[in-house]
Structure formats: C-alpha cells, structure tokens
C-alpha cells in the first residue's frame, strides 16, 4: 500500500510529536518502514520529506527526526540499498555524533548501518574508520545518560566484533578511547558489554610492542577496580543480570591477554586472602583461567606465592570432621564447599600445565611432617583438630596432584609411597639400609588411621587416572612407574585392609570403614592397567561376601560391605570388565542367590534378600540370575508351607515377592530381553499353586496374598500381549480345577444371595485374588477365555465381600469391546453381554437372563444389583458389598465414557436419600458406603484401572461425571430432610469435587463455593470425615489463591471467614488447622472493605492458635497474626 504524501507527513508529525502516545509513534514507524520495504516509498523520497526535521534548529524536533530515520534503518537491515545511499547515511550519522542533543538517534543509526546484512549493502572499511573516529572524537560516553551509554558501548562492541580489521590502524587511539569510555561505569547491563569489549580488544593487538601492551597498565587499572565484583542490584531488574554473569564476564576480561599478568596475578592473590568467600571463589576461578591463557613462562614467577596462597586456602576451607558413614565410601569423606572445589580445580590445572609446580608441593615442609603426625596419633579420634586438619589437607593435596597427570602421579608415588608403606608397617629398612616388605605386617595390632586415609586417597587418585585412559596409550609406560609400586604392594595392602575389616572391638568402626573403603578402592582398578591381579580381586570379593553371609546381623560392617559390593558390581557393568564379571558372578552373585534359595541360611531372610537384590541390580546377568533364584525359592517355600505348614516359609514368600516387586521389577523393565523371565516366574507361581492341592493347615495369610497380588499385577502389566495370554490361560486352568467354578451355579436371586457367606478356603481366596490381579493388569488386546462364566464367578465372589473381584469386574467392563468391532478382551463376550450378567434384571423368579444378549439391559433401580444396594434383600453385609462393587464397575464404565455409569450414579444417589424408592430406611453404614463409592469412582487408583494396567481412559471423563452428578447432589442437599442424609450427600459431593481438575473448580467457583462452605461446616461435626473435610478444604484453598476464585470469595467473605475461624480449632486433624490458617492469610488478597470488618474476630481466633500443640500450626498462626494485624482502616479500600 502506497503512502500518500499527506499521510507520510502525518506519520512524521506523529513520531516527532512527544505528546503522542508510544503506541501511536510505533504505528507511524511501522507504516513508514512498511512502505519502504514494499518499495512504495524510496529512502531518497523519505529523506527529502524529512529534511526539515533533520536540520531544524529546534533541538527536540531534530532529535526526534534523526531518531526516526535511525529506527527506520534498523527495521530495514536486510533491505538492499545501493552503496552511495549507504555511504551518504554513514556520513550523516557519523557527523551527527557531534550533535549531543541528537546523540540517541545518531548512535541507533550508526548501529543499524553497521549491522546491515552482507547482501543488502554494507558499510565499507573507510566508512567504518570515519564512524569510529567520529565516535572517539565526539562522544564522551560517561557523560551520557544510561540508555545512550548502553548504545555507545554496543556501537563499540559492533566495531570490534564485526569490523575489527577496519579499525586496527587506529591502534593507541582506540585503546585510549576504550579506557576513557569504560572508566567509572556502574550499570550492570553496560558492564556486561564493557567486559566483553576488553575481551574483544585483546586479540587485536597481540604484539609485545603493540598499543595494548604499552597501555595494559591503564586498561587493567580501569577494569581491575571491579574485582571482586560487588553486586547490589535486585532480582527485579528488567535486564535480569545475575552476579554470576557479570563475574564471568570480568573473569574473561582479566584473562583475555597475557599483558595483564603483572597486574592481575598480584591482585588475585591479594583477594584470595580476603575473608569474603565470594572474593576467594572469584579469585580461584580467575587464577585458573589466567594460568591457562597467560602461559607457563609468565606464570612461573608467581609459583611460590601461588602455592603458599593455595595451601592456605585448602587449610581454611577444610573442616576437621571426617565422615565414616556408608555414603562416604565413594567420596573424600568431608564436606567440600565451593572454595575448596575451586582450589582443587586450580591446583590440578597448575600441575597439569607445568609439572615443575609439583616441586613446590612435594618439597613443602608440611608434606614431610604429616608422617610424624600419623605415627604420633594412630587413632583419628586421638588427634587434636590441627593434626586432623593437617592429615585431611595433605591427603587431599597429594591426591589432587597425583590425579592431574600420569607424570605427576609417578612423582607423588616416588616421593612418598615407600615412606607411607613404612608408616603402615608394610615395609621396613634392613641394617644395610635396603627397604624390604615386612612379612609380619598383617598381624600388626596398630592401624594408623591417618596413614590408611592418605593411602586410600592416593590409591583412588591412581585408580581414577587409569579410568581416564580407554586403552593403553604411549604414555602408559609412564603410568607403570606409579602403578608398579601399587602392584608390588597390592598383596600386603589388601591384607592390611582386610585386617582392619576384621576388627571387632568397640572402637573398630573407623578401622572397619577404612578397611572396607581400601578394599573397595583396590577392587575398582580397571582392566589391563590394574595393579591388582585377578586372584587378589577375588580375595577382595571373598572377604566382602563373607561379611554379608556371616551370622552377625545387620551391623555397620555388613552395610559397608554391601555398599562396597554394589559399587564394584556397578563398576564392572559400566566398564564391561568381563574377567571381573565372571569372578563377581561366581563369588558374590551365586553365593547370595544360593542363600536366598535356602531355608536355613542362618540370617534374617529380609537381610539376605536386601543384599542379593542390591548386588544383583548392578547388571543384567545378575538380575536374570536372581529372578531365576527367587522363582526357585518361591516354589520351594510355598511347597514347604503347603506340605508341612511351616509359617516361616510363607513369611519368606511374602518377603521374596515384595523384594521382586519393589527392587527387581523396575530394573527388569529397563533391560531388554528379560520380560520372558518374569512371565516364566508368574506361570511358575500358578503351577506351584496348582500342584499344592490343599493346605496342610488354614491360615490368615493376608500379607502373602497382598504381596502375591501386587507381583502378579506388576508382571502382567509389563508383559507383552502374547505373554499376558500365556499367563491368563494358565491362571484360567488353575481356576477351573479348584472349587471356585461351583459358584457359577449360584443363581443371582435374593434367596441364593442371602445365603452367601465369606467362606472361601485360604487356597481358593489366593487363587481368586491372583486371578483378579491378572484380569486387572491385562491389556484390552488380551484374550480372556469363558468370560461370561468368569463374570458370574467374580460377581458372586464380589457379593461375598472380595474387593479384588469387584476391581476385576470394573477392569473387564472397562476393557471389553462393544461387540461390533471394538477392542475385544474376550472373543465370546461383548460389553452388552457382560452388563446383562452383572445387572441381572429378572430376579424374582430366579431365572437367569439370556446369555445371547437379546434381553433389554436395565441398569437402574429395577436390576438385582440396584435392589440389593437399596436394601431389598434385608442383609446389610450384602448391601454394602453390592454398593462397593457397583462403584468399581461404575468406575470402569466412567473411564471408558460409557453412559451406563449415569444409571449407576443414580442408584448410589438413591442410597443417600432419607426416603428412597425402596420404601426402606437405609442403615447409616449403607449410606456411608454409598457416599464413599463416589471416592472410588472419581479418585485415581494405584491397584487397578490406571494407565500402568492398560485401562481404557477417555479424555475429560471426570469432568463429564462432575457436570452430571453435582447438580443432582446440589438439589438433594437443598431438599434433604435428615441430618444423616445431608451429611452423606456432602461427603459424596466432597469426593466428586475434590477429584476433578482444579480448572473445573475455578470455572464453577461461584456455584460451588457456597456448597463447599456448607460442606465444611457439616463435615466438621463428625471426626469420622476428617480426611474428607481436609480434601474439601484444599479445594477451597485453591479457589482463594486464584483470581477467578477470589472474585467469588469477595461476595462470600463473611461466610468464608466464619467457617475458617471455626476450623482453626478443629481438634481431629492438624493439617486442617494449618490449612485453615493459611486460607485466612490468602483472604488478605480480597478488597479491603470485604475483610477489614472481620479483623478483630480473626485476630482473636489466631491468638488461640498460638498455643496449638503442633509447631507447624503455631508458625502459621504467627504469620497470619502479623499479616492481619498489618491491615488498618486507612488501607486502600479499592
């Protein structure tokens, strides 16, 4: 669209006029830029029209005009312009840099021209030089306002970053101008650019005789004053500049050129001795970068001072507490703060970069005196704190230095390892002065803790260094020097560590810890470079395994040994150590799995399972071995119980299954190819149950049944469909062979159902529970044989009181196909047929409904199930079981989006009425079950009908139930005639609304908030409903913290406050009191006029909460009192 001349003038006037809004000015800018972009207006025409605005003596108009032209150019960076126009514009904006009133526009224009795309016409080197000279001569950066300063720095950054070759000839002038421009800058955004400018400037002038070298002192004086960075800006700054970013920028600036070395290193060493932790951290980080970038030749002169400062930093940042806990086996054993970590990093950098620095370390007097300390104090606890600190620091310094490189490791070992072995009693000097191994070292009664700690640190350093080499390299010859020393002493070292492990006196915890840690370190040397032979490695495994299998209970040494074995197993698996894996399998895994399969291991079975599962989880082959072992152990123990009535065996089965489910199944799920192993385990469970015809004695094995159900669910849930079918077929064959099928002949009539008793044998109950678990976890694509008979069986057992049967029925109706091409869990039963069996209509005569599904399906109050729920049968037990079963069936239907759930919901609602269609007054227990049925329907279940167990889940199913049920419950609450019915209706409503997504609540807050408040009031009268009360209170809390809910809360403020005040003294649940006080604080977001009238009542109620027996409640009360006390009558009422 072409801009007419009069429109262009209007746009120009709008932008220049400072009285116009920023949005109007932006619109004018966009309109002009768009015209230029689509060539309906040329840049020449625009400049001609703007001549008056660009040259007028009115400073404000001229500044706005120049800024407009600059902003337009910024929008057209990719639009081609010919060289003449670009050259002219460069000249114009370079000249305007002298016009301080138009400085902003001039800087924006220069930046826009410098950033033009290559294909669109760019500035020439001559133009760049002219612009740079104009800037240096005319722009006093520090005299500008913040925005203009930032633009000026960005212009300098662009010159250095994109046009560096063009400005190289400016030399001294450029460096001097840079110093002048950045001197005294304080704004964080500008400083980020300033530090980058120095970093960009350094590589332009690398010559020792260049301008940067001669002016390095002045430039460093300008930036050095910022170190260490003192950052006071808040987190609310728009630019969101962090101290870490600024500090990193300053670090890069300081280390950018070696010409800063004479000034930077002394400054950094001085700040390293500061008492401010942040100064120490910044100094250490900067020294590390400087060491790398300045080079060895420049750093050498500072080595003495560096070592002294670094050593002092190690001493000041290290505590004297050395942990001997299990978690410390794979760590140094003491807390490392940021200062310590950065000191370690710097030391490693210095040693790795120049091996001569290691001379300062090795020759230090404290390195030599540490051996006297070790010898003087054999026990760590006997050491005074200065001695403990000395041992820990020197050990850390030597370990870090050894880990820096192969050469440094060799030097460290050659300097102190023999002396350390002598201190530990492993070597001794003969009369001729020769050093030989002490043959009696293993029987020494004194173990030097400091020496053991230093030895382990050095061994760990050597081990970690070897791990860094994937294979032997040309430098591995150097590695032999240090490793050969370890190899020559590996046998006595392992003996010393083993001796420490075997200590059994009261003061042996440190001995045991250091012994196990030493064995662990020796056992984790890698591959061909390992100084530990296979025989010695196996001796380590034997020692640690013998501790696990010893009949000594769960002691400290047992836990340490287990942790060490797990670490070694993980190490073997990670680095694919095939030889070590064979040893680990035969010595550790086989022994522990054998114990797990044994009924007479002499140890608590839980300990054996814990050790075996932890060890075997470290590798796929070990997992496979354990699952097979557990399968054998399960069959053996279950058989022992069936035959001999050994209750210890059935208890072992329970623990075994829990171990399999909780420890191994998650690991198996991560490993490809092990699924069939679990399927075989599940089928073996069924075979063993089938083989054991009857118990030798009856028992109440609820724990075993629950463990077996959980395992079966998990295994079936992760199995493939074909594998699920195999398990289902085996399970069905076992069910068919027991006494359970006899119940299929029980007619679904009141006469037959009233005679039902919960009288299944323990074996039948186990079979039923396991079969229900299989059905619960099966995929919709799995095939269930003889589904109609099984549905009848599950329905009867449901009415006998077995909840797993109800959950299985809910899962079946959730996954069954519709019979018309839908997903089929069973080939011989459609969803309609299943519902026909469950909701049996023709009950009076005792006739079954037609199995071909031709009869009309009625789910409402005329079905057998619904009449049982409504109390027609006269049996309270049967009534409550039917209600619970109906809830699980309804949940399955609801999740798949089947409309039959509405009829089920209506039956449950009918049970909540004071006068229902049955004409009978329902028992309070039945009404309670009906109310809680809505919790089953709406809440998420861990044991069935979830994604893990392949449930069919239709989106928004909870929202649909909410929209259907809530209006019905609301109407019934309003018309309820008894307090019991009213309470139960509120319980049902609470279950519904506390289980829907919060967005649903917020969208309906205006309607729901009065109901929630009434519900809180009603439910607070009965302690039985305390958990339901809390869930409802959480819903209210969610509405009070959202803007949608606050709008409704404003209208009900007096009722809400009154309700919450009562709940602050609710005696039955602490979290109710705590949450109600938090809600009172949230109410302060409401308009002042709504809440201020209740200030006195709230403060009086909170005074009582200050004496609450629970600390959390008292803390919330203090916050609430302070918040409510702070509002005054003069606060803003709008």
UniProtKB/Swiss-Prot annotation:
Keyword flag Cytoplasm: yes
Chain positions of HEAT repeats: 959-998, 1002-1047, 1050-1089, 1092-1130
Gene Ontology annotations for the cellular component aspect, listed alphabetically: cytoplasm; nucleus
GO biological process terms on file: protein maturation
Keywords for the protein's UniProt record, in alphabetical order: Cytoplasm, Nucleus, Repeat
UniProt-annotated location(s): Nucleus; Cytoplasm
Record bears the keyword Repeat: yes
Transmembrane segments: none
Function recorded in the entry: May select specific target apoproteins to which a Fe-S cluster produced by the cytosolic iron-sulfur (Fe-S) protein assembly (CIA) pathway is transferred.
Protein name from the UniProt record: MMS19 nucleotide excision repair protein homolog
